[in-house]
Amino acid sequence: MLQVAICDDQEIFVKKIRSIVDEYFGKSSVEYKVDVFLSGREFTDLKEKLTKYDIVFLDINMDELDGIQTAEILRKYNSGAY
């Protein structure tokens, strides 16, 4: 199963990205699961889960922990995520 994470602090963008992902994978036979995070901190606090994601959508401009910082932490735990 393909594991997808969406991390954005604005729900409107989360919903849009989610709909694009659902539309794309809905047309294929690929099984997938999407997890949503509303901050970089919320995403990175679950370090044990960071290793499971195959695709990660990150917002660059987030408060507290921006997308670049979030990506740096993600890479420490999951160098294979895209």
What residue spans do the PLM features occupy?
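Acidic, metal-coordinating helix/loop segments flanking the phosphotransfer/catalytic sites
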Residues: 36-55
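Acidic catalytic/metal-coordinating carboxylates
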Residues: 39, 65-69
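Two-component/phosphorelay signaling modules centered on CheY-like receiver
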Residues: 11-35
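Extreme N-terminal starter segment of soluble prokaryotic enzymes
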Residues: 1-4
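Conserved phosphotransfer cores of two-component systems
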Residues: 48-51, 73-80
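Conserved acidic carboxylate
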Residues: 8
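Receiver (REC) domain active-site loop signature in two-component systems and cognate sites
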Residues: 62
